[in-house]
Amino acid sequence: MNFSFAPLFLVTLILLGVVSNNNSITISATILLLMQQTALIQFVPLVEKHGLNLGIILLTIGVLSPLVSGKAQVPPVAEFLNFKMISAVFIGIFVAWLAGRGVPLMGQQPVLITGLLIGTVIGVAFMGGIPVGPLIAAGILSFVVGKG
């Protein structure tokens, strides 16, 4: 008999999402559980291959949309010369670099993904975080365990 813990893990994520009032975990885990338990399972490899990139695109659209709606303005060039703005630019560069280290690590050592997911779920469910953590966490982890 071949038993998979994936459905149990997804149900656990759904329950954690409901208890912690975190819609992103609840919806994501529900969609994946439905895909796994139906004929939609054939599309899981497609989601696995392109989901991260599509998620980053949607996240970027969400971050940039206030510029389009007028709720946020592009600051004048002079404002880029203050400490907060320069710090924001360098921190953005650093975090993007960290995530860039994390993606290859997740591909080279997929067993670590489980630990990163558990940590991310705990951070999202109980600490008010958002689920962009696995990439950054993998980047930080790459310093601990090496690049691959």
From Swiss-Prot:
Primary location: membrane
Keywords, alphabetical: Cell membrane, Membrane, Transmembrane, Transmembrane helix
Provide the transmembrane region boundaries: 13-35, 50-70, 80-100, 121-141
Matches recorded under Pfam families: DUF441
Instruction: List the GO terms this entry assigns under cellular component, sorted alphabetically.
Output: plasma membrane
Keyword Transmembrane found:
yes
**Location in the cell:** Cell membrane
Question: How would you describe this protein's topology in the membrane?
Answer: Multi-pass membrane protein
Give the domain of life: Bacteria
Q: Which family does it belong to?
A: Belongs to the UPF0756 family.
What is the protein named?
A: UPF0756 membrane protein NMA2160
Source organism per entry reads Neisseria meningitidis serogroup A / serotype 4A (strain DSM 15465 / Z2491)
Organismal lineage: Bacteria, Pseudomonadati, Pseudomonadota, Betaproteobacteria, Neisseriales
